[in-house]
Design a protein with these regions (language model features):
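A conserved regulatory-domain signal marking ACT and ACT-like small-molecule sensing domains
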Residues: 316-431
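Rossmann-fold NAD(P)-binding glycine/threonine-rich loop
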Residues: 88-98, 107-145
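General beta-strand structural signal in soluble alpha/beta enzymes
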Residues: 62-64, 79-80, 103-105, 128-132, ...
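A short hydrophobic/small-residue beta-strand
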Residues: 101-103, 378
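Catalytic, metal-anchored helix/loop core of enzyme active sites in primary metabolism
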Residues: 153-157, 165-168, 172, 184, ...
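N-terminal glycine-/serine-/threonine-rich beta1-alpha1-beta2 phosphate-ribose binding loop
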Residues: 1-98
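Substrate-binding/catalytic subdomain of NAD(P)-dependent oxidoreductase enzymes
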Residues: 180-278, 283-285
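Rossmann-like NAD(P)H-binding beta-loop-alpha module
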Residues: 122-203, 210
Length: 431
C-alpha cells in the first residue's frame, strides 16, 4: 500500500457506479484531507467497454476481465455495484478470500447470501460493508450495528421503496387511481419498465430481511419475509382511511416478539399523526424502537445516483480508516442468535375490511357472528351511504387478532350469499 493512496476497483458502471466515481473525483481533495489518504479508482469492470467509454474521460480504467482486478495486489477495496446474484456473489467471495475489502449495494444478494459473505470476510479479517443496500442515502445499517448497539431492538419498520411511496402519495394527494399513478411514476423514471419487484413488495422485502437480521442479531432471509403489494389499493380505500384519520403506506415491518420474529411487507393504515405518514413522494424513512433509545426515525432519499453513492463512499471511508488504523474486520456478522421467524398466519394485527353486502336487516349480525366464531373482535362497523343494485358498502375495523383466525373468518364470509364482494383487506398498524 502506498501510504498516500489506497486503490479500489468498481464492479459495474451504471447509475450508482457512475455516481460513486463522480463523488470520489469531485471530492478528492476534501476527502483526502478528511481521512489522510487518497482513494483512487484503478479499474472499472464493465460488460461493454465501448459503451462505458462514453461516460468517462480515462477509458484505460475500463476492463471486462475480472482477473485484472482479483489478481492485482494494489487493489485493496472492491466496490460491487453490479446487482443480481451472479456473478456478483462469485466475485465478492473471491475478493474477500483474496484479502480484499468489499463494499456492496446489492440488496438482492445480501438478503439471501449476506451471512455467507460476512462469514467469509470474518475468516479473512477484512471488511464487508453494505450501507447502501437498504434505503439508499439514509444511514441505517451502521447506526444499528454501532450507535444503537446498546439497545435491545424490538421493532424496525419503514417506507423503504420510493416507487410505491410516490404512487401512494399521488393517489392520496391527487385522487389518482393506481394504474394512473404507476404510469406517471414510469414516465418520471421512478418506476422500472417492469415494476413488479417494486409494486409487489419484493424490493422492500429484501430490505426488511437485511434490517431484521441486523436489528435483532438473528438471520432472517428474504424467503422468511411475507410480501404483499399495492396494486389492489384504490382511491376509495385511501378516502375511507382519511375519514378515519389514517394514511395508507407500503410498510416493511420487523418485530422481535417473545415467540419469534415477525417480518413482512404490506400496505397498512397508519395514524396520520405518525411520523411515517408525513413521508411522501420518493422519500424513504426507517423507524426503530429500542429499549434505551425508545423511538428514532431516519429519513432521506432512498435511491438515486448520488444518494446511493453517498452511502457507498461512506463505507469506503470506513474501510480506509480501518486500513490506516490496522483494525480491519472489527464488526463482522452480528447474527449470533437463532430466533425463529413466525409464519404470517401466526402474526397479530388489526384489519380494515371493505365489503359489499345485501342491503337488508340482519346481515351485519350475521357478519359479527362469524367474526365471533373465530375470535375476531370488531372495533368498528360503518355502513356507508353508497348503495348499488341492492347492496350496501360496509367498512369493518377489527381489534388485534391472529392472522390465521382472521383468514378463516374471511373465507366463511366469502361463502355467504349475503356477502356479494370482499373489496379490500388492509392491515392496520398500531393498537
Amino acid at each position: 500500500m502506498n501510504e498516500n493512496v489506497i486503490k479500489a476497483a468498481l464492479l459495474g458502471f451504471g447509475t450508482v457506479g457512475t455516481g460513486v466515481y463522480k463523488v470520489l473525483k469531485n471530492q478528492e481533495k476534501e476527502m483526502s484531507a478528511k481521512i489522510g489518504c487518497k482513494v483512487e479508482i484503478k479499474k472499472i469492470l464493465v460488460r461493454n467497454i465501448e459503451k462505458a467509454a462514453a461516460k468517462i474521460e480515462d477509458a484505460s480504467l475500463l476492463t471486462s476481465q475480472w482477473d485484472e482486478i482479483i489478481n492485482d495486489p494494489e487493489i485493496e477495496i472492491v466496490i460491487e455495484l453490479m446487482g443480481g446474484i451472479n456473478p456478483a456473489k462469485e466475485y465478492i467471495l473471491s475478493a474477500l478470500k483474496a484479502g480484499k475489502h468489499v463494499v456492496s449495494a446489492n440488496k438482492d444478494l445480501i438478503a439471501v447470501h449476506g451471512h455467507e459473505l460476512l462469514d467469509a470476510a470474518h475468516e479473512s479479517k477484512v471488511d464487508f460493508l453494505f450501507e447502501a443496500a437498504v434505503a439508499g442515502g439514509i444511514p441505517i445499517i451502521r447506526p444499528l450495528k454501532q450507535c444503537l448497539a446498546g439497545n435491545h431492538m424490538t421493532e424496525v419498520m419503514g417506507i423503504v421503496n420510493g416507487t410505491t411511496n410516490f404512487i401512494l402519495t399521488k393517489m392520496t394527494q391527487e385522487g389518482m387511481e393506481f394504474k394512473d399513478a404507476l404510469a406517471l411514476a414510469t414516465e418520471l423514471g421512478y418506476a422500472e419498465a417492469d415494476p413488479t419487484a417494486d409494486i409487489e413488495g419484493l424490493d422492500a422485502g429484501r430490505k426488511v430481511a437485511i434490517l431484521a437480521s441486523v436489528s435483532f442479531n438473528s438471520r432472517v432471509l428474504f424467503n422468511d419475509v411475507y410480501t404483499e403489494g399495492i396494486a389492489k389499493i384504490t382511491s376509495k380505500d385511501i378516502h375511507y382511511a382519511k375519514e378515519m384519520g389514517r394514511d395508507i403506506k407500503l410498510l416493511g415491518v420487523a418485530r422481535n416478539e417473545a415467540d419469534g420474529i415477525e417480518a413482512y411487507v404490506c400496505p397498512m393504515l397508519i395514524p396520520s399523526s405518525h411520523p411515517l405518514a408525513t413521508v411522501n413522494d420518493s422519500y424513504n424513512a426507517v423507524f426503530v424502537h429500542g429499549d434505551a433509545v425508545e423511538d428514532a426515525m431516519f429519513f432521506g432519499r432512498g435511491a438515486g445516483e448520488l444518494p446511493t453513492a453517498s452511502a457507498v463512499v461512506g463505507d469506503v471511508f470506513d474501510i480506509v480508516r480501518n486500513i490506516l488504523a490496522g483494525c480491519c474486520g472489527r464488526i463482522g456478522c452480528t447474527c449470533y442468535k437463532n430466533i425463529p421467524v413466525k409464519k404470517m398466519e401466526d402474526t397479530h394485527n388489526r384489519y380494515f375490511l371493505r365489503l359489499k353486502v345485501e342491503d337488508r336487516c340482519g346481515v351485519l349480525a350475521e357478519m359479527t357472528a362469524i367474526f365471533a366464531k373465530y375470535q375476531v373482535s370488531v372495533a368498528q362497523i360503518i355502513q356507508k351511504d353508497t348503495k348499488v343494485e341492492g347492496c350496501a358498502e360496509v367498512v369493518v375495523i377489527t381489534e388485534k387478532v391472529r392472522e390465521g383466525d382472521f383468514r378463516t373468518a374471511i373465507e366463511e364470509l366469502r361463502n355467504r350469499d349475503s356477502v356479494r364482494k370482499i373489496s379490500t383487506i388492509i392491515r392496520v398498524y398500531g393498537k
